[in-house]
Each structure stands twice: as structure tokens, then as C-alpha cells.
Amino acid sequence: KIQHCAFGAGVGLLLVLYFFLYDMTKTERGSFGTKIGVILATAGSAVGLGNIWRFPYLTGKDGGAAFILIYALFVFALGIPGMICEFVVGRHGGSNAARAYFKLSGGKAWWIVGAMGMLTSTIILGFYAVVAGWCLQYLYASIAGQLMGDEQYVMTYFQEFSTNPVKPVLCTLAFLLLTHSVVVHGVRNGIEKVSNLLMPTLFLLLIVIAVASCLLPGADAGIKFLFHPDFSKINKDTLLDALGQAFFSLSLGTSCLCTYASYFSRQTNLAKSAVQIAVIDTCIAILAGLMIFPAAFSVGVSPDSGPSLVFITLPNVFNQAFASMPAVGYVMSLLFYALLALAALTSTISMHEIGTSLLYEELHITRKSGAWIQTGVCAVIGVLCTLSCGAVNWLSFAGKSFLDWCDYVTGQMLMPVGAMLACLFIGWFAPRKVVHDEFTNHGTLRSTFYGIFLFCVRFICPVCIVIIFLHQFGII
């Protein structure tokens, strides 16, 4: 009966979302309607599963508040200037990423940067949807009470599910269709409206779970682990961790920010928006730490990072931490996986939009057709990634699954190269007047920080990205 209720709740949620979007006007190219819509939608593109399963772990491992300080410095030196680069290209072009680079470069081959971003985001969406589908399954399992058990049970549950040839595929396709249902309805009536709903909900869930976690006996050890400034832990690896997190957390190198900026109004302050988005992204990551570590330390569990943290470690933590209050543990587990699904959805929407906008504008087809093509391509990648996790052996080679190879190619090659080319283009090749006009909104804003921005883009950002690239390959 519980499973039937959970299934009905899931179907009901999809129907609510459908009718929420059904009467919206279908527009080929629109724009964000409000300032808060700009910030929430673009911040949603940056906020994702990495904020929850990587940043808190790095913070605790690398010196707590000391790591956060170093991370903030890299965000301002690399992340924010990199974001502004894509904002400048996107808003000036007012079109998909490839065409935006084409326009700003005067018809030169820089359009390849935008096309590369579309390729990168499509591959990422393919394998990201797999993990997002796992979030859906675990949300269902939480509702149905299927995650109650000891550590071995939780581990076995994940292994059996992730290697199943059918269930993960269905979950992946379901999440892609959920993403599709938002993107197909356009910018203002789809992406913006849903982001305005999802992001506040995400914040609320984070706060509720974090407060409950911090109130557990022994939670102070987790808070200390996360925030105590331990400068003795600062070393080369700490700096590289902070630099890499600042780069990957803000979706640089995927043309996502460029695509969203094409929907910005001419009155949007690009620099201010970049700072606000970076602050929101960091705050969510810190709240995620407050949600995870106090609960983990309260039961003596050493938290790790990545999928194993959220799909194996945390179910066990919830079961132990709230053993005397099983109803509370049930609710916390349910809220946590709802939060994960929402965080994943805000990211998949933006990745889907990159390819959708390029397809319907360049092929001169409707947004609906472009969205279906993008969904279909990502579905093929997603199914292959899902099956490579254990169901089909030939999809793994050289010690890596197809999913791992997709992650490797995008994270270690395409994203750093794309971000580097974007910075080089804005810093050295784009018309100076256009860049200055976009930064200052054609002189209506003060250009106090323009010189600092240009210096970072020309020198600091390329050096940082080269360091990230070399570190990814184990050279440094």
C-alpha cells in the first residue's frame, strides 16, 4: 500500500507540474522577466549535486574556515571573471552560444567555443541524468520506507539498484522528461517560473534539515570539523582543491552562463549578478555541510564524498541518528532526497537549454522540436551510461565505465579548454568597446572594477585554468 501511495504521489507530482506549465505561451526566444528570475535561474544552473556531496567534504578535510577563505579568493579571481566573460558574449549576441561567439568575433571561428559548450553540456546532461534518476528512485524509496535498515542493507540496496538493467534506465528517462517538460515551455514561462519555485524550496529544505542535524547530540563535533579554521592543513593539495571547486561549481566552460545571459535584459548588471550568483552557490554548499556533518559525527560516521556519501553513507546516518525517533528519520530522509532531486533539476534544466536553443535557432525549427532532439540525444547517452554501471560489461573499457569516460572527457578536457578559450577571447580578441559597454551597460554603470576584471581575464584566469588542467592529469 505504501508503494502504491508513493507511486501515486509521483504521478501526481508530474501532473501538477504539467498543468502548472500547460497554459503557458510557447515562445521561440524570450527573456527573463524579473531581476530575481535572472539570479535564481542562473544560480540554479550553478547549484547542483557537487555543492552537496563535494564542497562540504573538501571544507572539512582541508581546514574548515581556512579552506572557505581560500575558496572565496579563487571565486573572485577566477569564478566571477569567468562568469562575466560568458555573460558578455551571451547578452551581446542575444542568441545561442555558438551564434553569440560568431557575432562578437565578427564571423570568425570563435563560434567553435559555443559549439564545444553545447557538446560538453549535452554529454554532461546524459550522465548527470543517471545520478539524478538515482535521486528520484531514492526519493521514492524514502516515501515507501525502503531505506530503513543497517549499513549492509543500505549498501546492498544501492548495488542492486545501480546494476539493475531496467530500473535505473527508467529513472534516467523519467528525469530527462521532467527536465524536458520545463525547457519546452520557454524561458519566462518555463525556466524562470520553475526556478522561482525550486530555488526557494531548495533553500527551505536545506535550512530545515540543517537545523535538525545541528540539534542532534554530539553535532558540535561536525560543526567544528566544518568551520574550525585549521591553517596547518593548508598545502598544495588544499589550494588545488579550492581552485578546482571554484571552477567546476560555477559551470564554467559549458556555455550555460552564455546561453542564460542571452535572455538577460539590457539593464541587468552583469558584474553584480555574477557576485550574487557566486554568493548563493557558496551559501548553499555551506548549508549542505551543516546538513551532513553534524548528523554524521553525532553517530560516529566518518563522511566521505561523491555518490557513496548520499546513496550509502547518509541513509545509514539518518537511520542511526534518528533511531529513537523513526518518524523524524523518515521525514528527514524524504526531505533530503527531495532536496537532491531539486538541486539536480535546476542544473539539468540549464544544460538542456544550451542544446535546445542552438538546435531550434540554427536548424530553424520550433523550440518543441529542438527540445525533443536534445532530449533524445541525452537519453541515448544516459541509457549507455546507466547500463555501463554494471548491467552491460562491454560498455566498460580501460578500467572505466562509459559513464566514467563521459565524466573524464568533459571534466578533464572539454570544460577547462572551453573556459580557457572564453577567457582568451574576451581578454585579447573581442572588441574592447563592446566588452566595456556590456560591463558598464553602455556607460550607465561605473567602470570601477573593469580594469581588475580585464586583468583577471587576461592573466589570472588562464594561469588558474592551466593549473587545473595539469592537476587533472596528475602532472602537478
Which role does the model predict for each range below?
Residues 27-30, 57-62, 92-116, 129-188, ...:
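Inter-helical loop and helix-membrane interface segments of multi-pass membrane transporters/permeases
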Residues 37, 45, 169-170, 280-286, ...:
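Loop-to-transmembrane helix boundary motifs in multi-pass membrane proteins
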Residues 25, 132-163, 263-267, 272, ...:
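Helix-loop-helix connectors at the membrane interface of multi-pass transporters/channels
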Residues 12, 59-85, 167-168, 414-418:
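Extracellular loop-to-transmembrane helix junctions
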Residues 34-74, 261, 272-275, 279-282, ...:
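Transmembrane helix-boundary motif of multi-pass solute transporters/channels
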Residues 25-28, 32, 36, 192, ...:
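Membrane-embedded translocation segments of transport machinery
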